[in-house]
Amino acid sequence: MKLTYILLIAVVGVAIEAKSVKKSKAHHKKKRHETLADNYKLNRIKDSDCKDVADDCKAFGKLEKDDENSCFNNPDKARNECPVSCKLCVSKRSKKQSDYMGGYDLQPQQCSQQSCYETPQWSVQNCAVTCQLCQPGVSSGPVDQDVRCPFWGQYGYCSQQQQQQQTDGYISNNCPFSCNTYGSAQPAQQPYPYPIEALSPYQPNAMPTPPQGVTPAPLPPYFQQQGYGYPQQPQPTQPVQPGQTQAPTAAQSTPAPVQTTPASGKTTTEAAEETTTEAAAEGAETTAAPAATQAPAAAGQEGQQPAAGGQEPQEAQEQEGQQPGTEPAQSDKSNKKKHKKDKAQKKSKSHKKQH
């Protein structure tokens, strides 16, 4: 009985201790790390207050977003000490940017699809081509002043009459390039939600939501090569300088095989087969001595008949006379031997008569 009471007390004590530990953990729960996405409306720093005051702002602003020491993960320092380097100014322009008319990106290495909506004001001034706010290479053309302009133009919000009345012409006034480029788009059935608020740096869900069942207008030709999204500025082709050798193309470096044809009109394979056949025939004639002796006479009698392989008789005889061990050479040797034999027989007969 006492053992039961002791076990019951122990169980109750363990339960109370576990509950107290749980409350303690909940009370001392670590606060979530704050980023520039939190309280994003504070990221729009006025031009009069937008200046860097820390010495390491340039290096601080170049850190990647995922870096724990970046602007995104250190919002207090980004807003208070380095708003210029962290791209939080409303419309901060440098002297170089003040003359900017469009047609190219001022900071192409920092421009990307992601930057168009993470840092919208900075991207309008520095990434007009990447964000599709102007025509590439046309510096005197119109330039959009809102990164949402391509979306509004493709989905027909430029030509929506009710849209112009409700928004006081915000879209048409701020999107001259997109409204002109996508002028053939079907008008939107409903106006864009009003009021249209200005985007803030690192604002979550800054990309507008496409209306259901609506097909956007096609991209212009100078953006189609890069696919849907934000194209990169095409690199111009470098001309070949005098004295330099241009790298060969695939067609130039690999010439097509050429089949050689002899003068007789036959292919190389057929000519080789005929040469082999003629060599075998000549070898057979060399071993046959009686046939070799009669060959010159036969060749003389049949001088008008064409030689094998389509050659003329004279050409065949010339070829036979040039090769060593042929029939004329063998007949000369046999004639000399016969002449010596006859001479020896005459000498022996004359010697017998003298005796």
Curated annotation (Swiss-Prot):
Record-level GO cellular component terms: extracellular region; nematocyst
S-S pairs: 50-89, 57-82, 71-86, 116-131, 149-175, 158-179
Organism: Nematostella vectensis
Residues covered by the ShKT domain: 50-89, 107-134, 140-182
Protein name: Nematocyst expressed protein 3
UniProt biased composition (Basic residues): 335-355
Localization terms from the record: Nematocyst; Secreted
Signal peptide residues on this chain, from the entry's feature table: 1-18
Predominant location category: other
Annotated region described as Disordered, given as residue ranges: 202-355
Function: Neurotoxin. In vivo, induces pronounced contraction and tail twitching on zebrafish larvae, as well as death 5 hours later.
Family: Belongs to the NEP3 family.
Low complexity composition-biased segments: 222-232, 240-270, 277-332
Pro-peptide positions on chain: 92-355
Record-level Gene Ontology MF annotations: toxin activity
